Amino acid sequence: MKNIIDYKDYFIRATEYAAVACAQLRGCEDNNKADQAAVNAMRTTLMNAPIDARVAIGEGEIDEAPMLYIGEKLGTHIDREDVLPIDIAVDPLECTKNCANDDPNAMTVMALSPKGDLFRAPDTYMNKLVTSRLFKDVVSLDFSMECALSRSYSVKPMASSNFKGS
């Protein structure tokens, strides 16, 4: 059986395709249209991948938005013994309103774990913090943005030539 990291390219591709699909609708002023484009792109990509994935945490029930639904199975290798079963937490388009209004900070969100390892939370909105392992003990959702950035910079300074601010 493979390790979860062996499947990463399929999930990266799914988030990229979802991001591109909704980015093409930035400024369309229709939240559901942008969200549906991201959902369709992500679902199609994952349904055609040689994976055994299940949505453990999804988004959509709260606000009746288009969604990958909890319990939905994705992939061409469902229930195969030679494939690692994977649970996903997913929101194909986080901040749909921002995308529809051509505002910043919309993103595609996905987390992976071996089957059964994701905490099953009730439908609720959550804060998200995305870092590499390098920052695991450095930043926290309990910190202000300024504090988190300052602490991150103390671990790994960012070269000014790498910064592409707006």
Predicted ranges, named:
Residues 1-18:
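N-terminal hydrophobic or amphipathic helices/low-complexity stretches enriched
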Residues 109-166:
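Acidic beta-strand-loop-alpha-helix segment within the catalytic core
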